[in-house]
Amino acid sequence: MMASLMLNGAQNPKLINGIAPHGLGSAGLNIHNKCFFRKGVRRNMTLTCSISASRPASQPRFIQHKKEAFWFYRFLSIVYDHVINPGHWTEDMRDEALEPADLYDRNMRVLDVGGGTGFTTLGIVKHVDAKNVTILDQSPHQLAKAKQKKPLKECKIIEGDAEDLPFPTDYADRYVSAGSIEYWPDPQRGIKEAYRVLKIGGKACVIGPVYPTFWLSRFFADAWMLFPKEEEYIEWFKKAGFKDIKLKRIGPKWYRGVRRHGLIMGCSVTGVKPLSGDSPLKLGPKVEDVKKPVNPFVFLSRFILGAIAATYFVLVPIYMWFKDKIVPKGMSI
């Protein structure tokens, strides 16, 4: 039921082994392509997508501001595994999203960046020994939840910044980051770091949301956190120096591939590091100012808006779950 889109160098996208999502695809490309479905039916499809609202790293959205987001992370750690994941990041989605990462060797050294409560790490340690996995996150409250999970007891768990990783160059065999990029003030810097810490031939796998098409969802998304376009993911990987870049669409089964109604759908993007050393991309100093005092009135208003947005995005999948139960299979929802 999950639609898969593989993009090689952001060209020639094809939907494979899945259903065609409605209303989303590669923004700005206006691509017409042949799609092959499980039942052998071939159809023409036009891929279109909304454009995410650009914003400089110096003006982060609410949850992208590390200092303001501290309390959000603290609350999120309480409800993440039991409230957020069932609607937006299920075990089936996790396992399918990790498949392109090629976790085929239990002795691989794997970094789970933005690992939070360790939900994604639980999928990683199915294929790699826990002692070879490092979980990094900036939230001590999220990491405290990860430490409580028995399968992760042997993982190395550290606090850190995805945009300034505390690992040497050419360090890891695999870099995984799931549900984290939407919180980064400067995604390009984070993906550049992914390139740096990987060994030659190593693979990065970044899993995150895709910019919604519904106007109300776009409003909340632009105020709350980063929801990249599909081709933005590809562009960040290309600029960082990755090769063999591929993108795979993911989403809860009960969405039936639909990308309207304000739904958050996601993608898993992978790329291979072709050369040892740092990324060829040169960036200036970080512009995020975490030392600047927080205006309490601005913080309160942004916090309230963020809480409303969070509630909205929790309710939408519940609505779709009920709709999936009511509408007969095979019919559009």
Protein language model regions, located:
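A short acidic, Gly/Pro-enriched loop at the edge of an enzyme's catalytic core
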Residues: 163-175
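Conserved alpha-helix/loop element of class I SAM-dependent methyltransferases that forms part
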Residues: 87-109, 123
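A short SAM/SAH-binding and catalytic strip from SAM-dependent methyltransferases
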Residues: 173-186
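A short glycine-rich, Lys/Arg-flanked "PGG" loop and its adjoining helix->strand segment in the class I
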Residues: 188-203
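Core SAM-dependent methyltransferase catalytic element
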Residues: 253-299, 320-333
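Conserved class I S-adenosyl-L-methionine
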Residues: 203-232
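N-terminal chloroplast transit peptides
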Residues: 1-39
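Class I SAM-dependent methyltransferase SAM/SAH-binding core
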Residues: 109-165
